[in-house]
From Swiss-Prot:
Its cofactor is a divalent metal cation. The lineage of its organism: Bacteria, Pseudomonadati, Pseudomonadota, Betaproteobacteria, Burkholderiales. Keywords: Carbohydrate metabolism, Metal-binding, NAD, Oxidoreductase. It comes from the Bacteria. This is D-threonate 4-phosphate dehydrogenase. Homodimer. It is an enzyme of class 1 (oxidoreductase). Pfam families: PdxA. The keyword Ribosomal protein does not apply. NCBIfam families: pdxA. Substrate binds at residues 140-141, 278, 287, 296.
Length: 333
């Protein structure tokens, strides 16, 4: 592996949530600077407030471009967009914070396009605030696809002992079932396969969930969705030499994946994949957007308005997101 330390752009997320706190806490860990050169994209004054809340000894440096960053121990370099007014309360929905969260991502994408940073790691945003700020995206994943001009991406969640990629995400269950078709299933699995290979797994073992209980039980449950929507994709991939098994009942598949039988589980819809991951590792879970022209990792939790501003937010998910983002960027380099 290369000795290169990638520059990771950390977007601050929603300023009224726990994002500023977990960023300041994370960057106090020496392990982060051993893995990457962190560069926050957000608001210095908000990070200073968060630093006081958590008792951080780190100093903030406001800069306007990555070239100005020093990446010194004891200091946080922040590209300061200056969008958050002083005194904005924590834990309350804000259209200003929602718009700012979009602007941080927009700047991060521009910096990756200009090859000024090597990867993006995102703190959480609030979807309602994002919409109130005028940006009608379901979440980070769809926003990044739009900003990079990528027609199709996938969400992969990673937790201790489990990786899950989703065929569909932020749509209703009926819409998800209608959207699932062999081409989408096949492309999703291929994106997951390629991502795991880049992470060092030469021949990923992939298990594919069914849609119905018991994966349809040979047609007893549902209306033949497994036969129509999933099996053709699995057969096509197996013909190309991919190690793919399914469709399998989701409950037993996740059990088998947890004991190490599979490197990746393919979930058909949002809650099918999110539930098991969050049971196994909410604090250390990571969200990776697969299929973008840039590397993007994220915490696997929300803005936690109920505890925002109290200085008690857990930074472990961001630490893991930074570690995985740095690893992917280093392998690409």
């Amino acid at each position: 592996m290369s000795d290169y330390l990638p520059v990771i752009g950390i977007t601050m997320g929603d300023a009224t949530g726990i994002g500023p706190e977990v960023i300041v806490k994370s960057l106090a860990h020496d392990s982060v600077r051993a893995q990457c050169r962190p560069l926050v994209i957000g608001d210095v004054r908000r990070l200073e407030v968060a630093g006081r809340l958590v008792g951080s000894p780190l100093k903030l440096r406001a800069i306007q471009a990555p070239e100005e960053a020093r990446f010194q121990s004891g200091t946080i370099d922040c590209i300061d967009l200056g969008l958050i007014p002083e005194g904005l309360p924590f834990g309350k929905l804000s259209a200003v914070a929602g718009d700012a969260a979009f602007r941080y991502i927009e700047r991060a994408v521009a910096l990756t396009r200009d090859e000024k940073i090597d990867a993006i790691c995102t703190a959480p945003l609030n979807k309602e605030a994002l919409h109130a700020g005028g940006h009608k995206f379901p979440g980070h994943t769809e926003m990044l696809a739009y900003l990079t001009g990528t027609p199709e991406v996938s969400m992969m969640l990673v937790a201790p002992k489990l990786r899950v990629i989703h065929v569909t995400t932020h749509i209703g269950l009926l819409d998800a079932i209608r959207k699932i078709e062999p081409g989408l299933v096949q492309r999703t699995i291929e994106r997951g396969h390629q991502t795991l290979q880049r992470a060092g797994i030469a021949a990923p073992r992939i298990g594919v969930c069914g849609i119905n209980p018991h994966a349809g039980e040979n047609g007893l449950f549902g209306h033949g969705e497994e036969e129509e929507k999933i099996i053709p994709a699995v057969e096509a991939l197996r013909a190309r030499g991919r190690d793919v098994e399914g469709p399998l009942p989701a409950d037993t598949l996740f059990y088998r994946a947890g004991r190490g039988d599979f490197d990746l589980v393919v979930a058909m819809y949002h809650d099918q994949g999110h539930g098991p991951v969050k049971v196994l590792g909410l604090e250390a879970g990571v969200n990776i957007t697969v299929g973008l022209p840039v590397i993007r990792t994220s915490v696997d939790h929300g803005t936690a308005f109920d505890i925002a501003g109290k200085g008690i937010a857990d930074e472990r998910s961001l630490l893991e997101a930074l570690r995985q983002g740095a690893e992917l960027a280093t392998r690409r380099a």
